[in-house]
UniProtKB/Swiss-Prot annotation:
GO terms for molecular function: ATP binding; cysteine-type endopeptidase activity; helicase activity; ribonucleoside triphosphate phosphatase activity; RNA binding; RNA-directed RNA polymerase activity. It comes from San Miguel sea lion virus serotype 4. This is Genome polyprotein. Residues 1-55 form the SF3 helicase domain. Residues 926-1051 form the RdRp catalytic domain.
Length: 1214
């Protein structure tokens, strides 16, 4: 066999040499570790040869079934029958070999199968060690002891596996019991050993109490007996009930009161786990029809006691039998079933009265002490246990009890009694529906009392009627259908759930059906698009994910066999390696985006590390082609099929296994591969085509669109006729106009390409683990003032909330108002919005494309000289409409509460809100840092943006429209210009919907991550919400940080961390000096404003140069020569602009106003033909104060200014 490669599972070699490899060989240790050696003899042949020398062996010495052979399995590393290898390699005859183990041919074959499965499984599910017991007896007593244990197993319905000898043939699946071996004294057994002193097989009727221990004469504690008889590995749920397999009941409980439920469940738990039953009891109290599902979910995450307890629950929705001992088994059925019988504690295998038993037996001292302590604490535990459970339940009920809310003047003084009750949305709907259907004049207070009486199990007629009505309502809500099934088992009626239950959420606002998911645990990404895959008998196998249009993906070993998804078989099942793609008639209301990049998060949002290199791995389900990763999440059986996502939140792989007990952090990930399922897409408008060739365009990798879209030339900014001679004195000029501009001859295309270069690479951002922690902290902080919101129902109302003066995006030319006439949308816009909305309703991502342009604005002269000009990202009107429908109310809530939070979007810097900022700036013993950032938009890490969008989603109703908006905004933006489409690798487009809020959330997340990292690098473990210790003002890239001394001491490290994240923090004056705290006697600058205290109060002063340049330039018709004054001036608008400039200038003092502003105004009136009077200084101050305090209406250019700056955003953006 030299040179041959063995490819079979099992290799059997025969040899006539007792020692195939000499013990002195270098390869002896490696060889004997890898083989099992069986010595084969034929006793009949040897005896014949001994008794009849020289005669032929007769045929009767051989049998066709090989039963004539005697098989002796050697111990590990036994190179001969007498000795094993010496680990030191010095004297190989110094260690005697253990006696060989006698096995049968069937046992040897089964041992080979078990050994092969164990050795070849790189990825397995986690499981605990199963207890092993051995009963040592004489060789002639093995059959007697085996039969006695088999009889006692049948008598008590035990769960253990019984074997003769050392060979174990049963697999350790969930629900299996302990391993019990009947062995001889020669066997080298590892486990708990009990020596049999006598063996007397008694009749089955006499196998009561301690009889099996007396019959065997073993010294064995009651705890060991319980573990041996009733140990259960893991947790298993059986929906198919077989009466012959059910354990005998110890307790029967009818589910109608909380006390009975709490008392029954208490028996199954340890003291450390009894608190977990409180929530289960409350849920069953409120939703009795869901008792079976609630118990399944509760059992899945509960630690059970080491005592053996069997309880039968009789609920309105069915019957549940729960057996627990270390693990648990449960049988659930929709029928009314009473399991007869019941082995009492006195009649169990542990025996009857402990110290006064009729039969004497040997009791170990540990057992005597344990029984004594149990006897002492018996009465006290009965009283104290009930008290603790009911006390905790009382607190739990008080937590969910509706509270009355004060109004008006009593808002902050507590609620007055009898002033009303605040209902939840569900309770309000129930009250209205019950009152309408029953035609009752029922008040809210009466309804709540009736609801709680019914939930607590009251038996009066009103409570009984309400329970019946509520059960029917819940059944309709879960889309249950009462059907008649005719099969081999006869005719039966069952409740079939037609709609899927959503995965469980960790939110008190979730619907009750969210509490009873059948597998997906809390925190799984894209849980609305995940559905359970079940076996034909209802057992959970794994998960499938909806990727749109009724197409699902899962794993081959999950959907193999008789798998059912949403109560139907998969159709058009296609396998790509281990990945399974199929169709279903039942389509989930939302879907997930899929891609082929590298994952950074596991299904629970924890960071995953992987080289993303694929090969075949041996698993318990065969060879699987995938990649190996590492994650801190603990997985379990049934998690296969859950998604791994990249930094954009796109599903790129599915969970296929873990490293088991040896390496639980090791994960096997199956990558996504695209399969053509002949899906007809619902969205026709898209410029970037994946199947079109990629070309290089002026150094950028782009795809051709076939539709040339040129960059707009010229500018609408003109020099004022009052300053044709001295405009060079102004610090700003219109941005570069392209190749013909003598100030900077770079073409507009060149400027565009230069601006897009930073978007070709993504910034690294914070590490995923820290980012996840800080995201939870920020979400928790915002929950105090941001409320949950609902999605807009139609695209019409969402569209009319948009700014109609902005671009329609890459698919339709012009502005939005150009396509609306008398409030009616034209056909082009209507068709586009309709197609986008129909796709968004399916939860699918929209094409994330923008029309690119260059901003027409004033720029500092030094930036004009080098051709620096900012980009305009014109968002698709369809994407804007969908995002407005999804997040409009959330954004309004954040903007309305800017005084309470960190995000200052929506603040009016020319109003009393500035006073609130000033108060927050004056926190004692805190340092203040003013920070600005260079190239903020292009340095935004995609994973941080994705996390910010998830925070916004947290405060929505998580509808398919929201899922579509999130998937769209998380995807890579596409920029369209000059007939090409450029895909952004990293960064945040300035024209993206909610760009100011998302930028501000990014700002908070990265500053928080930098602070946490700096503190922990310094040895301070951050175990609190970091946002409770600091205050922030963020508006996009502008930031002010108010931090305590602890954080201030590590601020240099914070800014260093921000640079590692890819950001470029600078001082507000853009200098290269180190960022230092602002002294207490110096003003703080925020949003281009200086916040100071003046004689008129707290004011946010606009920069003087920003005010002065208002007089130098006028916005008019488009031109290539901006140095020539415009032909026509809109004098009313221009007069209002300069009047506003006077008001802002008045806040800088009379000297500046009189010496600088009044001459500029007078000259503008003279040369521009304006019809305004120069406001006197005190009049200007009084007018601004009136606007500030809200006593006078604000002019248009103040009221409609963007960015909170207070002046025209078109001219005054820097």
């Amino acid at each position: 066999n030299k040179g041959k490669t063995f490819t079979s599972k099992y290799v059997i070699m025969t040899s006539n040499t007792e020692t195939p490899v000499k013990p002195t060989s270098r390869r002896a240790g490696a060889f004997y570790r890898r083989v099992m050696i069986v010595d084969v003899t034929n006793n009949a042949v040897e005896k014949w040869k001994s008794d009849n020398p020289g005669k032929a062996v007769p045929k009767w010495c051989f049998n066709k079934d090989f039963s004539h052979l005697s098989l002796s399995l050697r111990g590990t590393e036994a190179y001969c029958k007498e000795y094993v290898l010496d680990p030191t390699g010095r004297n190989h005859q110094s260690r005697r070999a253990p006696p060989p183990q006698q096995v049968t041919l069937e046992q040897l074959a089964q041992k080979m199968v078990v050994q092969h499965t164990t050795n070849t499984s790189e990825f397995v599910t986690q499981a605990g060690d199963v207890p092993v017991f051995g009963f040592v007896c004489q060789n002639n007593e093995i059959d007697t002891v085996y039969n006695l244990l088999a009889a006692v197993k049948a008598r008590y319905g035990a769960n253990f596996n019984l074997y003769k000898g050392m060979v174990r043939t049963a697999h350790e699946n969930s629900g299996c019991g302990a391993h019990v071996h009947v062995i001889s004294r020669e066997d080298n057994f590892r486990g708990k050993v009990f020596t049999v002193s006598r063996s007397r097989l008694e009749s089955v009727p006499h196998l009561e109490g301690d009889s099996f221990r007396r019959s065997l004469g073993v010294v064995m504690s009651d705890k060991d007996v319980t573990t041996m008889f009733y140990y259960i590995k893991g947790k298993v749920i059986n929906d198919q009930v077989n009466l012959t397999e059910l354990p005998a009941n110890q307790h029967v409980v009818t589910v109608h009161t909380v006390y009975d439920m709490a008392w029954a469940l208490r028996r199954h738990l340890k003291w450390s786990g009894q608190w977990q039953l409180i929530k289960a009891a409350f849920e069953i109290m409120c939703y009795p029809d869901a008792a079976a599902c609630a118990l399944r979910n509760w059992m899945d995450s509960t630690d059970f006691s080491e005592e053996h307890v069997v309880t039968q629950f009789i609920a309105p929705g069915g019957t549940i039998i729960l057996e627990s001992c270390h693990g648990a088994r449960m049988w659930a059925t929709g029928k009314r079933l009473i399991r007869a019988g019941g082995i009492t504690e006195a009649g169990g295998p542990q025996g009857g009265v402990r110290f006064a038993g009729l039969g004497a037996r040997n009791v170990p001292w540990s057992e005597i002490l344990r029984e004594f302590m149990t006897l002492i604490s018996h009465i006290w535990s009965q009283i104290k246990g009930a008290t603790v459970v009911l006390t905790a339940l009382t607190f739990y009920l008080k937590r969910f009890r509706p509270r009355i809310e004060a109004k008006g003047k009593n808002k902050n003084k507590g609620a007055r009694k009898n002033t009303g009750v605040a209902l939840t949305d569900d309770e309000y709907d129930e009250w209205r529906q019950y009152r309408t259907e029953k035609n009752l004049d029922l008040t809210v207070e009466d309804f709540l009392q009736l609801r709680h009486r019914a939930a607590m199990g009251a038996d009066d007629s009103d409570a009984v009627k309400f329970r019946c009505w509520y059960s029917e309502r819940q059944r309709n809500y879960h889309d249950l259908e009462d059907v008649t099934i005719i099969g081999r088992g006869g005719v039966k009626r069952e409740l079939i759930r037609k709609g899927p239950l959503r995965p469980r959420g960790n939110d008190y606002y979730d619907e009750p059906d969210d509490w009873y998911s059948e597998g997906v645990i809390d925190g799984v990404a894209h849980k609305n698009a995940i559905v359970s895959v079940d076996d034909v008998d209802g057992m959970h196998k794994g998960y499938a994910i909806h990727i749109g249009h009724g197409v699902y993906i899962s794993l081959k070993h999950v959907v193999s066999g008789n798998a059912r998804i949403l109560s139907e078989e998969p159709k058009n099942l296609t396998f790509t390696g281990e990945l399974a793609t199929f169709r279903l008639n039942n389509i989930l209301p939302t879907a997930v985006p899929v891609g082929t990049s590298k994952p950074i998060k596991d299904p629970w949002g924890n960071p995953v590390s992987t080289d993303w290199q694929f090969k075949n791995y041996n698993t318990t389900s065969g060879n699987i082609y995938g990649a190996c990763g590492s994650s801190c999440s603990l997985t379990r059986q049934g998690d296969c099929g859950l998604p791994y996502v990249d930094d954009h939140g796109v599903v790129v792989g599915l969970h296929a296994g873990s490293g088991g007990d040896k390496c639980p952090s090791r994960k096997l990930i199956v990558p996504y591969a695209k399969v053509d399922m002949r899906v007809r897409d619902t969205c026709t408008k898209q410029c970037y085509k994946d199947n079109s060739p990629t070309i290089s365009y002026k150094g950028l990798l782009v795809k051709e669109t076939g539709e040339p879209r040129t960059i707009m030339k010229g500018t609408r900014l003109h020099v004022s006729p009052a300053h044709t001679d001295d405009y060079e004195e102004c610090t700003h000029q219109p941005a570069s106009l392209g190749a013909g501009d003598p100030r900077c001859p770079i073409s507009l295309t060149g400027i565009m390409v230069n601006n897009l270069q930073p978007y070709t690479e993504a910034s690294p951002g914070p590490d995923t683990a820290t980012l996840n922690r800080v995201s939870k902290m920020l979400t928790s902080h915002m929950e105090g003032y941001v409320q949950k919101s609902q999605t807009e129902e139609g695209y019409g109302s969402a569209f009319y909330m948009l700014n109609h003066d902005t671009s329609c995006g890459p698919y339709i030319g012009g502005r939005k108002k150009d396509h609306v006439k008398d409030g009616v949308l034209d056909k082009n816009l209507l068709d586009l919005l309709s197609s986008k909305w129909n796709r968004a309703k399916l939860g699918l991502a929209l094409p994330h494309e923008y029309a690119l342009g260059l901003k027409d604005e004033l720029r500092p002269k030094d930036k004009v000289a080098v051709g620096k000009r900012r980009l305009i990202w014109g968002c698709d009107v369809g994407v804007s409409t969908v995002c407005r429908a999804a997040f409009k109310r959330v954004s309004e809530s954040i903007m309305a509460n800017h005084a309470l939070g960190f995000i200052q979007v929506g603040i009016n810097m020319d109003g009393p809100a500035v006073e609130d900022l000033f108060k927050r700036l004056e926190r004692p013993k805190h340092d203040r840092y003013c920070v600005d950032y260079s190239k903020w938009d292009s340095t935004q890490p995609p994973k941080v943006t994705s996390q910010s969008i998830d925070i916004l989603r947290h405060f929505t109703d998580k509808s398919p429209i929201v899922d579509s908006a999130c998937a769209t905004l998380k995807s890579n933006p596409i920029g369209i210009f000059n007939g090409v489409a450029f895909k952004v690798a990293g960064g945040l487009p300035s024209g993206m919907p909610l760009t100011s809020i998302i930028n501000s959330l990014n700002h908070c997340l990265m500053v928080g991550s930098a602070v946490v990292k700096a503190l922990e690098d310094s040895g301070v473990q951050v175990s609190w919400n970091i946002f409770d210790s600091m205050d922030l003002f963020t508006y996009g890239d502008d930031g002010v940080y108010i931090v305590p001394p602890l954080i201030s001491s590590v601020m240099p490290n914070v800014f260093a961390n921000l640079k590692q994240f890819g950001l470029k923090p600078t001082r507000t004056d853009k200098s290269d000096a180190e960022i230092t705290p602002i002294p207490a006697d110096e003003p703080v600058e925020f949003l281009k404003r200086t916040i100071v205290r003046t004689e008129n109060g707290i004011r946010a002063l606009l920069d003087r140069s920003s005010i002065i340049r208002q007089f130098y330039y006028i916005k008019a018709e488009n031109t290539e020569n901006w140095t020539i004054p415009p032909k026509k001036i809109d004098t009313p608008s221009r007069g209002q602009q300069l009047y506003n400039a006077c008001l802002y200038a008045s806040q800088h003092g009379e000297e500046f106003y009189t010496n600088k502003i009044i001459p500029l105004v007078q000259r503008a009136i003279e040369f521009e033909g304006l019809h305004i009077e120069v406001p006197e200084f005190h009049h200007a101050v009084a007018a601004y104060n009136g606007y500030f305090n809200g006593t006078e209406g604000q002019p248009n250019q103040i009221a409609f200014a963007s960015g909170g700056l207070g002046l025209s955003s078109e001219v005054f953006e820097n």
